[in-house]
Amino acid sequence: LVGSEMCIRDRASNNAPLQDVVRAVQYITEHAGQFGVQAEDYAIVSYSSGGQIAGLFGTDAVGYKNYGLPKPGAMLLGYPVNTFLEFKPVYNILLDPGVCKQRYYKMTLSDYITPDYPPTYHWYGKNDMTLMTMCWSAQGPVLEKALARNHVTHIYHVYDDAPHAVAAGKGTDAEGWLNEAVAFWEEQVG
């Protein structure tokens, strides 16, 4: 499993959070022997906007291939943002003023899903008020349709009680999701 703390807020310009994921995977794969892990078939676990960024790393177009890294064995995403919708121009002004280049917050994850996308386990909570403010129907449901349309092996859960920022889901309907997701990953990589 790969996890990292990504640059956020005022440190998130110039695609810094995506570069954080790249550096974490590079470091772990370069030191796999030292850490006693395999450099291939790794899983990435991430949440919320980090789920969108990690999800983009799993794509052919802007992710792992562009950095000469092995493809993830699975994406394990808790309430990932699919699109920042109306927040895109605000992020551009706050994070990258005057920059017209492609940035992670301008990308809609579902637009980058291809048949070669890694197996994915993703979930959302019906009472996730953060994603509600970002048009819930443009988040999980659209990502789910893209995975299904591209025949990507995946599992999708929508929980009644799993508000935003619950991570492992302790004390919510999502409790235990991480164990189920790890089992899904292990099944995919054999």
Regions found by a protein language model. Name each.
Residues R9-R11, S48-Q52, V81-L85, K126-T130, ...:
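Solvent-exposed loop/turn segments at secondary-structure junctions
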Residues P141-E144, A148-G190:
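C-terminal catalytic histidine-bearing segment of alpha/beta-hydrolase fold enzymes
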Residues Y42, T120, T153-I155:
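Hydrophobic anchor at the start of a short beta-strand
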Residues L1-I8:
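Short, small-residue-biased leader/transition segments that mark boundaries at the very start
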Residues R9-A39, G169-A174:
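Catalytic nucleophile-loop/oxyanion-hole region of alpha/beta-hydrolase
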Residues S13-N14, L69-G78, L85-L95, V99-R103, ...:
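Mature catalytic domains of secreted/periplasmic carbohydrate-active enzymes
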Residues Y67-A74, P80-E86, C100-P141:
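The feature captures the conserved acid-bearing segment of alpha/beta-hydrolase catalytic domains
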Residues R23-P89, Y104:
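Primarily recognizes the serine-hydrolase "nucleophile elbow" in alpha/beta-hydrolase
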